[in-house]
Amino acid sequence: MLPEVIENKQLIGVKQMQAASHVLMVLPRASKIDALEKIPYLEILRSALKRRRMQPDELAKSPITTDLAQGGVASWLMLDDGASRFEQYSVLRKGIALLTAEQPREIVLAVFGDSKQRTLAAELAVYVALINSAVLPSRKQKTKIENVKKIVLYGDQSRHGHAVARAVAEGNTLARELTMLPPNELTPTHYRAQVKKLARANDWKNEEFDFKRLKKMGAGAFVAVARGSHEQDAAIVHLSYSPKGAKQRIALVGKGICFDTGGHNLKSAKYMQGMHEDMNGSAVALGILLAATRLKLNIGIDAWLAIAQNHIGPLAYKQNEVITALNGATIEVVHTDAEGRMVLADTLNLAARAKPDLMMDFATLTGSMAVALGSRYSGIFSNRETLLTQAIAAGTRSGERVNSFPLDADYEPALDSKIADIKQCTMDGEADHILAARFLMRFIEQRPWLHMDLSASSCEGGLGAVASNVTGFGVAWGVEMLRNLKL
């Protein structure tokens, strides 16, 4: 559970700071300390900057801490109005991290500047404090981690109680919690049980297409991957959020590979490490659905989660097989470690049959996207130029940055097969992120579609607003897309 937020319109004073144990001081950017007014303990900050040989405006990138007279600690930073949302979130994350390292039960946020500056600073600081206050999964016996119970804000009072910040933070936290669970605690069986609990708690309609049902339906692409698991507990899970009066329906599709060995084309130990996080796309879809539900968005949402594992064994699919997908297309298997596009093919086609106004899928799909972008951006593809424009704008506003890639038809011949309708991938791997998107496009029935290849699902040291290595990237972006969607 995220902490409560208590708001005070008045600026923080010396008395409140003396009573606080952990304070985040968010100042407007200024080149000189003398330009700042009505800020308690400013002389302490001045001395700390002098000791570090820092200029005041360096606080816009590198926060510092000072001890307070009554035993508390203050983290000082400056927020630049002209910086990007990503840059603003990044400095706030660094400032909050200096406080959360001590596991405080309460954090005080103090914002300064004119009314416009304080409102922006409060909005961003509350979000960053919320998103970094939850205790994430850990199984250390001797280390008890306390989560933040209360956030107290001085300097601004919102009209809506920071509802958007709380909803997005809750959705992001859910995505990270699921992604970080060890693979013995999040098998497809466990995952499906957790999803059922979420569905009951949030009044979502829940339908499961289990292994036997999918096999009977002819979902050969999904079944090919799922059949390698002895338990045969894989499923496509369909969740529905249906507010009254909603005129649009959106499909969220997520890759949920709970562990990826690579199959017969077995990964090495180096590249198998961390493959319990290969279900991150489905967790992001769930996080967006949860946030949209909390915000009561007037959009119908169907989430389709492709939950399976990619195991090696006598029944596992192998190279050179020809598989028939749900839409009847035949697929030549080239590499068993390209399982994500296989499970997504049938899941996308199942989602497309409901004729949604927009389909958005999320997947940790290709290594080539990580090579192209690193772990600070995620890549997007679309069959509609207008959606790409909206997607990039949503990334700028949310602080979850995305970069678009081409889907030109002249990439298609690389997937030509002599024995099937399409190759799963190529052996040389050139432009695999683009070829994977071209492959998926075969299964969307020409519906408006956005595909996100989640190269930023994990970033060492955190990313933007989020301090953990697992970022939950895509939840804030997805909510921003839905809140401002134009179709």
Positions of predicted regions on the chain:
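Short amphipathic alpha-helical segment within the helicase RecA-like ATPase core
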Residues: M1-G256
